[in-house]
Amino acid sequence: SGGAVASAAVGGANLVMTACYINTLPYELIIQESVKSVEDLKGKSVGISRVGSASDVAARVLMKGLGLEPVRDVPILQVGGPTERAAAFRTGRIIGFPSPPGTIHLAKGMPHRVMISTADFKKRYEFPYICSTTTKTYLASHRETMRRLTMALVEATHFLKTRKEDTKKFIAKYTRQDNPQYLEDSYAANVKLHDRVPLVTREGTEVQIKEALARKPGATLRVEDIVDDSIVRELEKSGFIDKVYK
């Protein structure tokens, strides 16, 4: 994600995002059924994988969407991946956790409800989430390879948007899940979230840069240091993307 790229770049990594296929955070806040109001969340912990991760950003954004101040009103705990978060949720160590749409359908025997989703926001929360990332050196020396990769992923996005049943089979295969509701929700979310033209969100990248710089005083980083989506712009200008979608 853009947050990880920004953090790595602040630390000296020579990375650049060349395209972003999802430019927002596809997360919902899963909470215990006992939580009936926003007030019930205060003082109770929400679980994430690790600080700086997409789940961390999502937790903070969702808290603010509820009018709460992350950490101050609702502590954020690093508890690990999906399995660890589910275990912490079952035992009551955490009152909730951010989750991609549909994933909760895989958690059998866990009484829960969705309190808020980024899909509920009136304005899309800009965040470079699923992006093609490489080093500046590789992009300069293998630009044609990166161009062909981008073309293939634009075509794959079109396949996703137009071949529902086939796409659900791929989701089932690579997630190793066959829960019908999960597959349906996952597909519906992905169709909505994937951008037709995969430009990298400048607004979202700027926010992630500010977050990364706040963790490393004295460092400097600009959007243009970690974003080069010129290949996408070339493909759009050439008519390639329009041709794919005809």
Regions found by a protein language model. Name each.
Residues 31-46, 140-143:
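Flexible hinge/capping segments at coil-to-helix
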Residues 64-79, 91-94, 111-113, 181, ...:
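A local structural motif
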Residues 140-219:
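Secondary-structure end/capping motifs
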Residues 1-16, 26-39, 55-62, 83-88, ...:
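Pocket-flanking alpha-helical
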Residues 210-246:
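Conserved C-terminal helix/tail region of periplasmic/extracytoplasmic solute-binding proteins
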Residues 40-52, 151-158:
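Short loop->beta-strand "edge-of-pocket" segments that line small-molecule binding or catalytic clefts
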Residues 3, 84-175:
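Pocket-lining segment of extracytoplasmic ligand-binding domains
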Residues 14-20, 44-47, 115-123:
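A structural signal for short loop-to-beta-strand junctions that line the ligand-binding cleft
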